[in-house]
Amino acid sequence: MNAATALARPGLEPLVTGISDIVSRRLGPRRTAYTVADLLRDRLPGLDILTPQEREGSPDGYVSRPLYAHEDFSIVSVVWRPGQETVIHDHVAWCTFGIISGIEHETLYRDMGDHLLEIGRADNRPGEVSGFAPPGDIHMVRNTSGEIGVSIHVYGADVSRLGSSVRRVYDLPVR
């Protein structure tokens, strides 16, 4: 994809326009993440942003699908079947996410060098939005609900070009 690629999604334009305006202000990663989170809270799309088939997810693991990509940010849907989870990881850039359905249970960690220290947990429910920026963004996410979970993630990078929002996967003991 080139500098800006809109993947036709009815209803996405108000979110794209708002994020473009915020990103153009060059507020810094953490402030950008929090400002985009405020916008996403007001403009979080509904389930109809995905087709019924896309909302089914996959039995093989959660599915990330780019909805919009630009050199400065990407909008990605993530679909999780019950019990599906990520590995422990951090990100290449700031991130904001909003929950459309399901419950995303997030466990937060701090890298202590030879191990990870669990520093928090949160259950993110439909309508809830959060944002963060590296460093300090190490987490694992799991759909703990009995239904398919759908969330919208906004990353401060072109993940269609990078292939992923993940910077590093952590395989350290947790204490």
Model-derived segments and spans:
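Glycine- and acidic-residue-biased ligand/ion/polar-headgroup-sensing regions
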Residues: 93-110
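A short hydrophobic beta-strand segment most commonly corresponding to one strand
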Residues: 96-98, 146-162
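Short acidic-glycine-tyrosine-enriched beta hairpin
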Residues: 111-139
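Domain-scale activation on soluble regions of proteins
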Residues: 154, 161-175
